[in-house]
A protein has these predicted regions:
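N-terminal nucleotide-binding beta1-loop-alpha1 segment
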Residues: 1-17, 197
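A generic "binding-loop/recognition-motif" signal
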Residues: 10, 19, 54, 204-207
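The conserved acidic donor/metal-binding loop of glycosyltransferases
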Residues: 99-102
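Conserved alpha/beta core of the MobA/IspD/sugar-nucleotide pyrophosphorylase nucleotidyltransferase superfamily
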Residues: 1, 158-225
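Conserved core of the sugar-phosphate nucleotidyltransferase
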Residues: 104-183
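Conserved N-terminal catalytic core of the sugar/cofactor nucleotidyltransferase
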Residues: 2-5, 25, 29-96
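Phosphate- and divalent-cation-binding pockets in alpha/beta enzyme and binding domains
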Residues: 13, 57-60, 79, 106, ...
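Conserved beta-strand segments of alpha/beta enzyme cores
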Residues: 22, 66-68, 148, 197-199
Length: 225
């Protein structure tokens, strides 16, 4: 299984404690290294890290953990641009994840096993509303219907799940992003959802956290010990 890890952005909300989210130390180990360790534990053998801001340093961590890298020179653009940078290397199916989301191997295994011929992507969702690790003011909200994404975004008023930041994707996603100008990943997800090609899989039995600010970093460090 291939995994594409988006690690190009600047991550301004953690700048007070770290110069770069992927390089942030979580209990003494770089966040990106922990993500790659958990991917390996889940059986992922072909990780590809998309670098950008502080790319040489991020690439050094990725290479030390056994991953390949690809630099996105437009790293200051929305994250859909990093997905498009990976398009020439994208396999028929791949995990797609964010370098600021730390997930247990069970999350990756569950999403990797959720492929279906009637979907161009599958998003891992968490239905544990009110979980203390979730930042309700910032988490991406998902409204689902019959196992598919009906709506997705940070400002939804009606929703029944959180986006855990881990997808199983196919080239349908990059095809949806390609015509757009400086797209975000969610733009591609919405395009597939409009065609009923965006499915979901429940990962609520497994833990994950979006390490987006000092509070979340403290929670993550307590989790990994």
């Amino acid at each position: 299984m291939q995994a594409i890890i988006l690690a190009a952005g600047m991550g301004t909300r953690l700048r007070s404690v770290s110069p770069s989210k992927p390089l942030t130390l979580v209990a003494g180990r770089a966040l990106l290294h922990r993500i790659l360790d958990n991917l390996r534990a889940a059986g992922v053998t072909r990780p590809l890290v998309i670098t950008g801001y502080r790319g040489d340093e991020v690439a050094a961590v990725a290479h030390a953990a056994g991953a390949e890298t690809l630099h996105n020179p437009r790293w200051d653009q929305p994250n859909g641009v990093s997905v498009l940078a990976a398009a020439p290397r994208l396999e028929a199916q791949a995990l797609l994840l964010m370098a600021d989301h730390l997930a247990s191997p069970g999350v990756y295994r569950t999403v990797a096993a959720a492929g279906r011929p009637d979907a161009g992507l599958v998003l891992g969702i968490d239905r544990r509303m009110g979980h203390p690790w979730a930042d309700e003011a910032d988490v991406t909200r998902v409204s689902t219907r019959a196992g598919r994404i009906a709506a997705i975004g940070k400002t939804l008023n009606t929703y029944d799940a959180h986006d855990c930041g881990v997808f199983l994707v196919t080239p349908e996603l990059t095809a949806a992003l390609a015509p757009l100008t400086a797209p975000g990943l969610s733009d591609g997800v919405r395009a597939l959802a409009a065609r009923r090609r965006a499915a979901v899989v429940d990962i609520s039995a497994h833990d994950w956290i979006d390490i987006d600010d000092p509070r979340a970093l403290a929670l993550a460090e307590a989790w990994v010990g």
